[in-house]
Amino acid sequence: PAGVEFVSVIRLSQTSETGFSYSPSGAALTNAIVNNPGARWLIGNEPDRRTSIQDNVEPHVYAAAYHELYYLIKQTDPTARIIAGTIVQPTPLRLRYLDMVLSSYRQSFGTTMPVDGWSIHNFILNEVSCAHDPGNCWGAEIPPGIDEPFGEIVSVEDNDDFDRFKERVVRFRQWMKDRGYREKPLYLSEYGILMPPDYGFEAPRVNAYMNKTFNYLTTAADATLGFPADGNRLVQKWSWYSATDQNYNGWLFDSGNGQMTAMGRNFANHTSSIAISNDLSPWKLLTTPATLHYTGTPLSVQLRAQVSSSGNSAIPTGPAVVRFYRGDPAQGGVKIGADKFVDLAGCGNVAEVSVTWTGATAGVHNIFVVVDADGVIAESDEANNTRSFTVLVGTRRLFAPITTR
């Protein structure tokens, strides 16, 4: 149905000290990639969880599997978006697991791990090694590849700890920024209440947690940590657990008769009250070639504008016209190329359009990008549709040595 997005998950399995397998694979995976152009692909599901029902792979194995799948998918569909992580919860212990993944990737492949986004779960679970304390190792255990007796210890009553939930979201965004991934989206692909009703988590308590977290995720932003393409919001998309799984809690529909539960009705009532908004703006301007060197002959430069939508519409809004100018169009700036168009859903989605700028000469140039110049689309912020970017066409190039470790 309209507005529903399905995200594919490729499950991982460690087969030896360095070996791995994944599912789907072979022709089944290739066909899925071809039949779903531009799809998001989650690589692994809770790879940091020691259990037979989750992926349970050591960090170096995750890095190797991710590398293989990233390039396999991108070679088949360059528009695909590859999402890393999907850890159980962003605690310090599990961020250490991800740091080990990144370190292994760099050691093995000589570069930073490429991602199109990060995914996390955010359940509030105990972290105790079953080898250390078998009587109290319920929850998330200790990630494979890490030998610690415990990490973050919580009680069953903490399963709806809202302050802890928020703290973890901020912690992960800080982790992303510190490792150079701030300009990537964050997806909270699974969270909710796992403790069953007979543990004290009846529907009213679950619904209260749902409402608080939904309100937070809808509005939480940080000018130094958030995703710039989405108004600096911390989380771009999230998914409540679960739709029908009654083995835990939070199910929106009865798995037997398909009827909506009290939690499902709360979900529907809460989300139906959220007004749909659109907010398009120019985000980045890139050039091809990346470095512009003038040697006496005017250059032909490809200007590539990335346009983002920080509204919340699940359905693409458009087409919206995008225009390029050399100089401020309000003061006689000269239009570059023909009109281009974008059709974007919200929550930080980005589209790229380009024009060719001919006759570029040496100097500093102000290139303006204007989105929805004719005001066809109603937006929550009409003041951010125009942005100027500085493009330098230099006359000299300096080559400097680079050392890496």
Model-predicted regions and their roles:
Residues 273-405:
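Extracellular/luminal regions of secreted and cell-surface proteins that mediate adhesion/ECM remodeling
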Residues 7, 198-205, 209, 216-286, ...:
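Aromatic-rich peripheral "rim/lid" segments of glycoside hydrolase catalytic domains that contact
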Residues 1-7, 35, 39-40:
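Catalytic domains of carbohydrate-active enzymes, especially glycoside hydrolases
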Residues 15-171, 178-183, 191-215, 247-260:
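Active-site cleft segment of glycoside hydrolase catalytic domains centered on the general acid/base Glu
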Residues 2, 37, 78, 114, ...:
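Residues that flank catalytic or metal-binding motifs in active/ligand-binding sites
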Residues 10:
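Early extracytoplasmic/lumenal segment of secretory-pathway proteins
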